[in-house]
């Protein structure tokens, strides 16, 4: 299943127990950003550059959904291959989570460490923080600019910022990674030209596209046999059991 998913265009994975709660949220995101989804053909055929901004709530499910939305788009535009899609996914996901956790939710390194050691799930802490209206009303702004050569991204939260230099300096106590704290370095490893504003609540980075990359169909369907239908041929009837 994991290997099959590597080549798919999945926007979000929802467990059955959370289907009733999470599916409407994912569908709202897709509906809200349908213009972005339908820009693919226009972009590859007519437009050289597209840009925009996603406004996100402090919800980890949204992070996964928006990350897949962007990386799948670039993959389907033939701008990145599957390996680079995974690298970009890591960079975007880690920096968006940092914006929510440490920016809007003001979760300190020590607080996160204690929570992970005791309970093991940072998502529960984020949702606990969001019970406060002052936290819940904050937003993360995820901006993009996509050109044929590269994609540029900016992520800005409404928090107080942080001293980002200490987290990329290996000699700094906070630079020595322990139970967590890998996000900034991982993003810097996979993306290029990672830069912060002086306040530390905004990060920008670039991701170079593959040259002459061609992705005709999703990898998950590469081994599927092509089926050609004739005009007026009946493909299936209502109530018939699927063979897939």
Please tell me what each predicted stretch does.
Residues 227-244:
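Regulatory nucleotide-sensing modules
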Residues 50-81, 156, 160, 164:
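Helix-loop-beta hinge of the Bergerat
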Residues 21, 34-62:
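CheY-like receiver
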Residues 1-38, 198:
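Output/docking surface of receiver
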Residues 1-11, 123-125, 147, 232:
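Non-catalytic regulatory/interaction regions at protein termini and inter-domain linkers
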Residues 43-51, 100-228:
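Conserved beta-strand-loop-beta-strand hairpin that lines the nucleotide-binding pocket
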Residues 71-93, 115-118, 174-178:
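Conserved short strand/loop->alpha-helix "switch" segment adjacent to the catalytic nucleotide/phosphoryl-transfer site
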Residues 94, 98:
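Conserved polar catalytic motif of the HATPase_c/GHKL fold
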């Amino acid at each position: 299943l994991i290997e099959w998913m590597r080549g798919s265009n999945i926007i979000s994975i929802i467990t059955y127990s959370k289907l009733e709660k999470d599916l409407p949220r994912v569908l709202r995101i897709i509906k809200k950003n349908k213009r972005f989804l339908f820009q693919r053909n226009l972009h590859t055929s007519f437009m050289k550059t597209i840009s925009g901004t996603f406004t996100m709530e402090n919800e980890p499910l949204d992070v996964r959904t928006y990350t897949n939305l962007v990386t799948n788009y670039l993959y389907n535009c033939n701008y990145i291959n599957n390996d680079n899609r995974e690298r970009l996914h890591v960079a975007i996901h880690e920096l968006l989570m940092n914006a929510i956790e440490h920016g809007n939710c003001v979760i300190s390194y020590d607080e996160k460490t204690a929570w992970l050691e005791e309970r093991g799930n940072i998502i529960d802490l984020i949702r606990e923080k969001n019970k406060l209206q002052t936290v819940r009303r904050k937003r993360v702004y995820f901006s993009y600019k996509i050109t044929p050569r590269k994609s540029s991204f900016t992520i800005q939260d409404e928090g107080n910022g942080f001293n980002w230099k200490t987290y990329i300096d290996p000699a700094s106590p906070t630079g020595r990674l322990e139970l967590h704290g890998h996000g900034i370095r991982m993003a810097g490893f996979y993306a290029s030209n990672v830069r912060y504003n002086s306040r530390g609540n905004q990060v920008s980075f670039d991701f170079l596209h593959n040259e002459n990359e061609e992705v005709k169909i999703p990898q998950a369907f590469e081994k599927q046999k092509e089926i050609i239908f004739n005009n007026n041929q009946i493909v299936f009837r209502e109530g018939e059991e699927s063979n897939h």
